[in-house]
A protein has these predicted regions:
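Active-site-adjacent beta-strand/loop module that shapes the phosphate/pyrophosphate-binding cleft
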Residues: 15, 63, 72-95, 105, ...
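Generic C-terminal helix-cap and adjacent flexible tail
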Residues: 1-4, 129-135
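Conserved N-terminal beta-strand and adjoining loop/helix that marks the start
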Residues: 1-20, 41
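NUDIX/MutT-family hydrolases
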Residues: 88, 97-128
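Short secondary-structure junctions
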Residues: 59-66
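Conserved Nudix-box catalytic region and its N-terminal flanking loop in Nudix hydrolases
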Residues: 19-58
């Protein structure tokens, strides 16, 4: 049986003090308890940036402005295949909050390794480390 690939828009948000935003997956979700970059599924009628804006509004109550492509990650979890279409969010409006009840954390480079992330997020973490090192 062929699995379909879930296309996911992901946002890397770094604040002015060089901290990146992570959210914790809620109980009852795939990979519950892991920390991840915010985002969600791209719907058939959306572009990646439309999906990212919608998801960050739903999850964090922020609207995105300028973004730049960061990395594409394809990963097979065995029970699910994902394509993470990752963009750095350069501008946003509002203050991020866990609208869906998810804990949020602004994390500095020295603390990144303390946060357990899904395997598909490992390449994103490597890119974020590069970004935070250059801040």
């Amino acid at each position: 049986m062929t699995q379909s690939i879930v296309h996911v828009a992901v946002g890397v948000i770094i604040d002015d003090s060089g901290h990146v935003l992570l959210g914790r997956r809620l109980k009852g979700t795939h990979l519950a308890g892991y920390w991840e970059f915010p985002g969600g599924k791209v719907e058939p009628d959306e572009t990646v940036l439309q999906a990212l804006d919608r998801e960050l509004k739903e999850e964090l109550d922020i609207r995105i402005g300028a973004t730049s492509p960061l990395i594409d990650v394809k990963h097979d979890y065995g029970d699910k295949q994902v394509w993470l279409d990752v963009h750095r969010v350069l501008e946003w409006q509002g203050t991020a909050k866990g609208v869906e009840g998810q804990p949020l954390a602004w994390v500095g480079i020295d603390s990144l390794s303390e946060f357990q992330v899904p395997d598909a997020n490992a390449p994103i973490m490597a890119e974020v480390r590069k970004l935070l090192t250059s801040v």
